[in-house]
Amino acid sequence: MPSCSTSTMPGMICKNPDLEFDSLQPCFYPDEDDFYFGGPDSTPPGEDIWKKFELLPTPPLSPSRGFAEHSSEPPSWVTEMLLENELWGSPAEEDAFGLGGLGGLTPNPVILQDCMWSGFSAREKLERAVSEKLQHGRGPPTAGSTAQSPGAGAASPAGRGHGGAAGAGRAGAALPAELAHPAAECVDPAVVFPFPVNKREPAPVPAAPASAPAAGPAVASGAGIAAPAGAPGVAPPRPGGRQTSGGDHKALSTSGEDTLSDSDDEDDEEEDEEEEIDVVTVEKRRSSSNTKAVTTFTITVRPKNAALGPGRAQSSELILKRCLPIHQQHNYAAPSPYVESEDAPPQKKIKSEASPRPLKSVIPPKAKSLSPRNSDSEDSERRRNHNILERQRRNDLRSSFLTLRDHVPELVKNEKAAKVVILKKATEYVHSLQAEEHQLLLEKEKLQARQQQLLKKIEHARTC
């Protein structure tokens, strides 16, 4: 490889022609041993160390492997390593890593991408760019245009092996060596991800007419394959469900786990959307005396196969009606004050117009048609009164305990006495008072008897 004689940093030799005009030479490439000289003129790259870490792009871009001959720039060392026969083309290494049969599975290496960066939009853009580049490189297509066939579902590695791994139609003699060689080096995403991504049943593949002059759609066992037009003939389908074209162009194929064709998406949408909503009616009613809103949804669900028969379509038609009353109630413990009484005023008018009745028969509907706001106010007043009475009862009980404590001589000066202590001491004090009362009553009886005796003596002394 030729080396450049000019370099911005002292003591640095550029061996890569791609990095000849770079202001700072990167230090993470294989020729990093000869970057610096040991002479006294060499300076350590301490001031540029942070700039060197910014040279490599993040995330690293995949090297362009397919069109090395059309590019005007000289190939980089990564491309040369990927295209090196001694490093990647040995059959011993392919057998050791299990990559020997990947050449038949991947006819075109341009479609294969890294698993981390793959996507439907990137695939479509890449296929479009490849087809345009092939048309510009090979010339205008002779007949037809690019066609896509409906995908035959997600194919597992076992299914691919059953369908014939060697059935990938490749015209190696018509393609350049630069395009045909990296196909054996690419890794099929199906090997990395053995499980299918889209689990769909295989759709029946229509047979290509034998009298078609243009190239028919190339059908892959994994997914939709974009085949560039211009092939003179179409080979008969192989047991693996794969057709190959005998012209100069390859079928741009992708694995079933990675991509889906547009026609397959349309078929899946038709299968998924078996039922569609025909009628959606939204009705909102508001009563004059009530702020409650009732929303009525009428949904008619009619299947797509209604054209099979009128009786079957009528039997399968389904009408769903649902009323959604919107209640705004903040107190969840109280009973719901919302009563369906919106139709009460019309009934009351009909009754009053049909046959006039006394006032007593009209009063009950009025009591039923009270607004929720009035009922809420009544409930709040009732709860407020209950709270006031309960608070008053607790205050009276506390004051009675304090009074009882003041009457017990042992607890007069004890302000922190508990209610249980107050009750016990008060009971003992009452028992002592009762005993004292009994003694006093006995003494009173004795005194009364003594008084009677003295009165009798006084009367006897007067009579004598």
UniProtKB/Swiss-Prot annotation:
Compositionally biased residues, Gly residues: 160-170
Post-translational modification Phosphothreonine, affected residues: T58
Entry GO terms, CC: chromatin; nucleolus; nucleoplasm; nucleus
Example of a GO biological process term: embryonic digit morphogenesis
Region (Disordered): 129-172, 196-294, 334-392
Positions of region (Interaction with AURKA and FBXW7): 61-89
PROSITE patterns: BHLH
Interaction with AURKA: region residues: 19-47
A GO MF term: DNA binding
Effect of W88A: Abrogates the interaction with AURKA
Function: Positively regulates the transcription of MYCNOS in neuroblastoma cells.
Name listed for the protein in its UniProt record: N-myc proto-oncogene protein
Organism: Homo sapiens (Human)
